[in-house]
Amino acid sequence: MTDDDNQDFDNQDFGGRKGAALVAGGTGGIGAATVRMLARRGSAVLFTYRSNEQSAEALTAELRAEGAQVESVRADLTDEDEAASAIRSAVDRFGALHTLVYAAGPHVPMVHLSKVPPSQYRHQLHADTLAFYNLVHPALDALRASAGSVVAVTTAATHRYPVRDGLSSGTKGAVEAVVRALAAEEGRYGVRFNCVGPGMLTDGIAARLIENGELDDAALQVTRRNIPLRRFGTAQDIAEAVTFLASDRAGFITGQHVAVDGGYTV
């Protein structure tokens, strides 16, 4: 356990909060960091995973050993019934739902849109934008009851477009539009909706792009020069923003996109 982990235990933003947080995509880089941070800051957590059962079991065991209330459930969020079942599981197991974090989504290759056929774009919309809607819609009643919060992890690319990122920015842009609409409509019930837009990270999808060669050394150098802080972020940086927006400390913030990108979108 690191010093940062110990600081998480000192910060109990969610201590005593009735119910649980649901994190969609809890075995991904950002998702797992968010699960850990929420749990260590006092929240019960249920997270979803699609196929990586081994990682889900390991994360659950790790946090339970620390005394946290953590459970996982397999769910294909492109399936409307499975997404709704995940919401019911959180409410049934923990009594209420106070936070919903969408940190799921498919791997997104770096490719020019001219090379993306409509069928591939349709699949991306289904696997990301529709998956988010499948999850958030059945959660509304529970979130109204708790005056809860939704945080969608999107991308900084919706505010400053990098070439070959249209598959990500287009579908995540649609998620952001839904978030703003829900913020306007659900605020009367005390429910808040926000987005966190990651920039280039050393883990998560960005790490996979580097590993498979879609981003070579030259591209990485250019990217780093475009970031005022001259470095890449981490999943921990994103989780910090997510948990802040989900907490009562952000109680008057809704309908916003918070870029966590080292200044890339400046």
What are these regions (language model features)?
Residues 106-107, 124, 149-175, 179-188, ...:
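Catalytic loop of short-chain dehydrogenase/reductase
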Residues 41-58:
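Conserved glycine-rich Rossmann-like NAD(P)H-binding loop of the short-chain dehydrogenase/reductase
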Residues 20, 27-28:
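Conserved glycine-rich cofactor-binding loop
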Residues 95, 142, 231-260, 265:
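C-terminal substrate-recognition "lid" of short-chain dehydrogenase/reductases
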